[in-house]
């Protein structure tokens, strides 16, 4: 199991280090200035904010968008909870990453690149835990005047753990923590900074 985990981590590391947008990337993600946050709600009333520390992404010249999240980088501010999420919820040995793909109209990018602020409704495909689902997501794209684009969700996105076969993992987390309940509905917010590819 340890060797398999190391091999998966090596493959993921190579993917993260590779030029994520290939030759056609117009903008590449600045991981250090980007954030994907999600909220877990336990015992029906206690909310806690978590995040991911490592991801790569790009926007292509044709408006194709891809974001890959390293699930092993989950950060809950409690080390043992990080490990439980990796092992019991995400099963990162088998499913080391989540991926979002979308298509943005070139006109949206052109307007934002001129310094504009554009709101767009996008069908975003989320691939997680071996399953895929298309999510309607409202995003705001802001041109920052230096060739960079900031993209963020206009409102939180609700993801249902059951849609991705994660409900047994949620139950496992609930049991090991001795909680009465953990919600399967998870609000997610995204804030991304893309810089012009070199």
Predicted features along the sequence, with ranges:
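Bacterial N-terminal signal peptides
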Residues: 10-19
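Bacterial N-terminal signal peptides that target proteins for export
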Residues: 2-11
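Extreme N-terminus of proteins, especially the signal/transit-peptide cleavage junction
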Residues: 4, 21-25
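Low-complexity, acidic/polar, glycine-enriched regions of mature
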Residues: 25-198
């Amino acid at each position: 199991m340890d060797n398999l985990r190391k091999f998966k981590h090596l493959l993921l590391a190579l993917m993260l280090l590779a030029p994520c947008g290939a030759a056609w990337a117009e903008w590449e993600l600045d991981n250090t200035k980007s954030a994907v946050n999600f909220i877990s709600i336990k015992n029906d009333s206690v909310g806690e904010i978590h995040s991911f520390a490592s991801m790569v992404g790009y926007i292509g010249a044709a408006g194709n968008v891809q974001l890959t999240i390293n699930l092993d980088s989950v950060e809950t501010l409690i080390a043992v909870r990080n490990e439980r999420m990796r092992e019991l919820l995400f099963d990162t040995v088998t499913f080391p990453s989540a991926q979002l793909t979308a298509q943005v109209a070139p006109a949206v990018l052109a307007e934002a690149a001129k310094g504009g602020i554009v709101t767009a409704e996008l069908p975003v495909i989320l691939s997680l835990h071996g399953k895929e689902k298309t999510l309607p997501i409202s995003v705001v794209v802001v041109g920052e005047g230096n060739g960079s684009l900031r993209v963020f969700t206009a409102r939180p996105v609700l993801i249902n753990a059951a849609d991705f076969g994660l409900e047994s993992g949620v139950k496992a987390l609930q049991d090991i923590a001795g909680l009465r309940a953990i919600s399967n509905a998870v609000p997610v917010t995204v804030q991304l900074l893309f810089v012009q590819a070199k």
